[in-house]
Design a protein with these regions (language model features):
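Short S/T/G/P-rich N-terminal loop/turn motif that feeds into the first structured element of a domain
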Residues: 16-290
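N-terminal Sec-pathway targeting helices
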Residues: 1-12
């Protein structure tokens, strides 16, 4: 995806900051966020004035972006060659692809330009490397648990392909990717039932210090069109969201212990890399404009 260079200089430099944002700062948002169906990722390099990121994000919070459901910043710290390499993966959530296209096609507003000009040295984003995904976020908000509100959390990324397994155990790529998506979505309900039951039973787990588990959510990302290499090496990315690293490891260990039957059902249509990618992630909600 290639846009006019000066638009990237103004706009893409602008999606900034790997940091914690206070959710309570946006209590007066007049429009309830919609569940996003489309998401974009950009790989960005930390600039020389990274220390100014808090000022930049504070100003970002005062702008309106039509159709944007929210933003995340991810910085890999384990499980990938790019860990701690001075880059941030910036993620945008949109109500729809149409809203995202309208934003990019219309170009930045004067307010947006002025803001970007003030802060362009904080982060530099590779506009030509933008990646487009359809996103499923099936778990209801009222089932996720209580996030602590500081905007910081842990993402654990599975890199996966849709596959078939022959009777002799040979694993092959699935030709019909849409069938793979159908089978995956058909398991969301059973997976969420498993998570709910685990949360219900958490009070007697020896590792549970509070008598309950921390919050949990997940998102599944499939390509919308062609994305740059090497991202097309995988058919989908499954991302688990936890409040802390400790919580992530405890839940993953519990999955190994109790989730074998459900894992076998996922294995019928998919294969994921054994190495998981851990990222420290942060939330940023812009003003919402219907």
């Amino acid at each position: 995806m290639k846009l006019i260079e000066n638009i990237f200089a103004i706009a893409l430099v602008a999606f900034i900051a790997y940091m914690g944002i206070d959710f309570n700062a946006k209590e007066d948002v007049p429009v309830k966020p919609k569940t996003p169906t489309f998401s974009q990722f950009m790989t960005c390099e930390i600039g020389e004035n990274w220390s100014n990121r808090f000022v930049m994000v504070d100003e970002w919070n005062d702008m309106k972006v039509s159709g944007m459901s929210g933003s995340l910043g991810h910085r890999v710290y384990a499980g990938d060659d790019g860990a701690n390499d001075g880059t941030v993966s910036w993620q945008l959530f949109w109500d729809s692809k149409q809203k995202a296209d309208a934003f990019w096609n219309n170009g930045p507003t004067d307010e947006f330009k002025a803001w970007a000009d003030r802060h362009r040295s904080v982060l530099v984003c590779d506009g030509e490397g933008i990646r487009n995904y359809d996103v499923d976020l099936p778990r209801p908000e009222n089932k996720q648990g209580e996030w602590n509100g500081d905007g910081e959390f842990v993402s654990v990324v599975y890199q996966c392909n849709f596959t078939t397994t022959a009777e002799d155990g040979t694993v092959s790529p699935m030709e019909d990717k849409e069938e793979g998506k159908r089978q995956m979505r058909a398991l969301y309900g059973e997976f969420m039932d498993y998570v709910d039951q685990e949360d219900k039973n958490a009070s007697w787990h020896i590792w549970s210090k509070t008598g309950k588990r921390g919050p949990y959510n997940f998102g599944v990302y499939t390509h919308n069109g062609e994305n740059p290499d090497p991202f097309m090496d995988y058919d989908f990315y499954w991302m688990n969201y936890y409040e802390t690293d400790e919580e992530a490891k405890a839940r993953l260990a519990r999955w190994v212990e109790t989730g074998a039957d459900l894992q076998a059902k996922f294995d019928e249509f998919s294969t994921c890399e054994e190495t998981l990618i851990y990222t420290g992630s942060s939330v940023l909600f812009p003003d919402l404009d219907d």
